[in-house]
Regions:
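Conserved, single-site charged/polar hotspot
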Residues: 1-161
Length: 161
């Protein structure tokens, strides 16, 4: 049985998003079955009335525009992506922005235009085990007893499934 895949919302309602692809990724546009390109490096996505324009760092023209841009690693687990200025601790006293890295696919999805203008969401499509590893390492201290870390993994896996 294949490992379950999860769609985890990372960023909601942004006009612009800066990110870095560490490794090579296939770029699929608007649910196309075949990749449009192989990409890596630094990028900027800007949401407008025609969808999401994808700009290579320093470029004068966007590479392409689409309603959904899926960046899928050529080899799962060997490449990651870094999102700049991600807000963590939303609505808590410790809310702040930081740059965070993720394994799996990055999906940039245009929302329906509203009075707030064109916006996009960033979604991480990732395998269950990679997700659990990231959750446990982000929520628990490395100094926790092994039994506590194992219990957290069992609880998290049970909750997801």
């Amino acid at each position: 049985m294949p490992e379950p895949r999860l769609r985890v919302g990372l960023i909601q309602g942004r006009e612009t998003l800066r990110f870095r692809l560490d490794g090579l990724f296939h770029l699929l546009v608007d649910d196309a079955p075949e990749p449009t390109a192989r990409v890596g490096g630094r990028w900027r996505a800007e949401c407008g009335p025609d969808g999401i324009a994808l700009w290579r760092h320093g470029a004068r023209e966007p590479l392409l525009t689409g309603r959904r841009l899926l960046l899928r690693p050529l080899v799962e687990g060997e490449s990651s992506f870094l999102l700049h200025e991600m807000t963590v601790g939303v609505d808590f006293h410790w809310q702040h922005d930081e740059d965070l890295s993720f394994l799996g696919c990055l999906s940039l999805e245009a929302r329906e235009a509203s009075s707030a203008g064109a916006r996009m969401d960033a979604v991480n499509e990732v395998g269950l085990e990679a997700y659990l590893l990231s959750v446990i390492s982000s929520e628990m201290s490395a100094r926790c007893p092994t039994a506590l870390l194992e219990a957290h993994a069992v609880i998290s896996r049970s909750w997801l499934l």
